[in-house]
Amino acid sequence: MKIVHCVFSFGIGGAETMLIDILNEQSKTETVSLVIVNHVYLDFLLEQINPAVRIFKLRRQKGSYSPFPVLKLNWLLYQLNPDVIHVHSSALLRIIALRAGRGLFLTVHDLHIPLEHAGRGTQLIAISEAVKADIQQRTGRMAMTIPNGIPMDKIEKRTRRASFVGKNMRIVQVSRLDVEKKGQDILIKAVALLKERGIENIEVDFIGEGRSEPRLRQLVQEYCVGNQINFLGLCDRQYIYSHLKEYDLMCHPARYEGFGLTVAEGIAAMLP
């Protein structure tokens, strides 16, 4: 079977993490390709994909209205002649013309994703029961639930018992720095509140990057908790999987989530 996965970009996120695993597993038995439409991708992530997967980069400039990338995408799909086209953004359905006689799937990776371009011929996949319920409530359509998976054997396990005598309690949060969704500001304010109450043996590491980093750093200064909050920046999955065990607690103060893949990774590392 020939399977083509289509994405606009390939950066840091739960969808990309999941897609890497899917590509690697499917390529063991099927002919698999990945098409990245925009000129937005991280090479170190692409290096984690099995070389058997063919990767096509169309290098469209994000936000471009040029018709040439659209034509290039459809010409490529025509040449690949896949049995299955699997898209990971509903907006891609607006520009893909090659559909007849092929399985067309859309994985909905979060809550509140617009689905006006997903016709009745598109089979919807939800990453959680919450996403499935959201789809049904907004559109009346039924989706198939396939929960995100994680490679349990690659995540090192925490074995020591928590003890905070004479040392800090280490807390980790792994996600894009986006206060509107991921809620890092809530955790910073909680640390500041505990400091006001005389509890200062708490250290928080934020792993990730994003548009809210300047705002979060300013918040850290305003609350005078700079000695307790660390911004570690972007770390690859190998680093995260080998270092989660060093923490005492994972905190994910998201305001909403479709699934929360990093929470599952924390549980796999035996973190409370």
Go through the PLM ranges and name each one.
Residues 260-263:
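Short glycine/serine-rich donor-binding loops of glycosyltransferases
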Residues 217-235:
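Nucleotide-activated donor-binding/catalytic signature segment of Leloir-type glycosyltransferases, i.e.
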Residues 255:
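Aromatic "clamp/platform" in nucleotide-sugar-dependent glycosyltransferases that forms part
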Residues 5-68, 210-213:
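N-terminal strand-loop element at the rim of the active site
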Residues 13-21, 169, 178-195, 204, ...:
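A conserved mid-protein helix/loop that constitutes part of the nucleotide-sugar donor-binding site
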Residues 77, 234-235, 242-247:
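Short alpha-helical donor nucleotide-sugar binding micro-motif in glycosyltransferases
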Residues 65-69, 86-93, 108:
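Short His-centered aromatic/hydrophobic patch
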Residues 130, 149:
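Carbohydrate-associated surface elements
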